[in-house]
Amino acid sequence: MRETPTFIVYPGPVYGWAVTAMGSTQSHFFSEKKVAVSYARSWAEANRPARVRVETREGRIEAEWVYEPFRK
């Protein structure tokens, strides 16, 4: 069974917000937090089961969503 993917939304290094899959070396950058969160939630929903975590600049968890597998 595969590990549940976690998509993390965090403040960008200079400005804006970034989204990455845990363990990935690539990020997607957005100027607005709302857009970054929406992107991460859509990404997680398409890859159920999955979770989305929004982190502060200090690394604290600000919000989290869990997407369960589709029911048969």
Annotated model-derived regions:
Residues 27-28, 37-38, 70-72:
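A short local loop/turn or secondary-structure capping micro-motif enriched for an aromatic residue
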Residues 49-56:
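A short amphipathic beta-strand at an alpha->beta junction
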Residues 26-27, 62:
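Local beta-strand/beta-hairpin segments that build beta-sheet-rich folds
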